[in-house]
């Protein structure tokens, strides 16, 4: 409990900008499924029911808020649930980057992550053929490592 309180207080001060943006996004998504994932607030939103301008949000972290888009029809599928858990761990790693970089997070992590995401998914077949994983570069590789390390720690 103390760990979560410290995490939230740092996110709301040092990571204020991205946490405020995350809170706004959470409110814009409306009534969706919210829960704590470790210390962060995770929103699993149904991509078919959110407002049009939010449909392409994908999976993203903003401060202490994690957003994962999923089609409601696929929500109970075990393979998809396992993949969502892996994505949640990765996105949780981004929340640790927020703790480290604070007000510079959006410049150091957010912008490069967005550019890499757009580039990777526009050339996915080419990168896959060359054996290049989405998670092979900064900041994605670091986020995955942080998410894995956080998952190994005792609660």
Model-predicted regions and their roles:
Residues 56, 82-86, 105:
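Alpha-helical hydrophobic/aromatic positions enriched in membrane-embedded helices and signal peptides
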Residues 1-2, 94:
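A short, terminal or domain-edge coil/loop segment
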Residues 86-98:
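Active-site recognition of the HExxH zinc-binding catalytic motif
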Residues 99-107:
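Transmembrane alpha-helical segments and their cytosolic interface motifs
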Residues 67-89, 134:
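Short pre-active-site segment immediately N-terminal to the catalytic Zn-binding motif
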Residues 2-55, 61, 66-70, 106-155:
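Metalloprotease/metallohydrolase-associated module, dominated by Zn2+-dependent proteases
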